[in-house]
Amino acid sequence: MEKDFLGDILSVRGEFGYWVFEGDTVPAQRPSWNYRKEDDGGIIIDMLCHWRYVLDNLFGNVKSVSCLGATHIPERVDEHGKRYKATTDDAAYATFQLENGIIAHFNSSWCVRVRRDDLLTVQVDGTRASAVAGFRKCYTQHYGNTPKPVWNPDIDQPIDFFEGWSEVPEQEEFDNAFKAQWELFLKHLYTDEPFPWNLKEGAKGVQ
């Protein structure tokens, strides 16, 4: 984005989540409090704060947000084998309007089966190119490689839409993200380097 590879950014689409087992036939891989409102659970409070700083720092300040939360699995089994009622959201469908006009939409769910490159993928569509990034890999499609599909549901799709994407080559090794964050904070403490990620920035995520 710094080199304007994508052109004018039009939209950002995020898909996050995976199937968290209910706990009866297969043990759940997330703690039961995640699904109880009385224990401060819920995917909205868990994930939307992350989407906020991703959008603010990469694409533009969030101007407004609308979010629909849902409790798709009404009952689960806890760590002790006891059934309990899910009292908070296990999926969230959020649309963000940024100050610069970019529209972002993020689906977050613990009730979805993964058919994408990673547990989180973010697609950025621009006038010159598009990019799809996961945690470790990124794929791009330039304007010149963009296929021209024609709507015809009566025949098999002749275009392999994955074929026109190219993986971005690794040009550097990235250290552990939490380690990098701690290093920035320690530099701020001992050398007074700027550190914009303060309590106010954290509070923005739960406004």
Would you name each region that the model predicts?
Residues 13, 93, 201-204:
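Residues within well-formed alpha-helices
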Residues 122, 132, 151-207:
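C-terminal helical cap and adjacent loop that interface with cofactors, partners, or active-site loops
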Residues 33, 110, 164-166:
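Tryptophan-centered motif/residue detector
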Residues 13-26, 137-162:
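Mobile, glycine-enriched helix-loop/loop "lid" segments at the mouths of ligand-binding/catalytic clefts
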Residues 29, 125-126, 153-154:
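Juxtamembrane/interface motifs at transmembrane-helix termini
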Residues 5, 52-145, 179-195:
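Contiguous beta-strand/loop segments that form the cofactor/metal-binding neighborhood of enzyme cores
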Residues 1-85:
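Predominantly a Rossmann-like dinucleotide-binding segment in NAD(P)-dependent oxidoreductases
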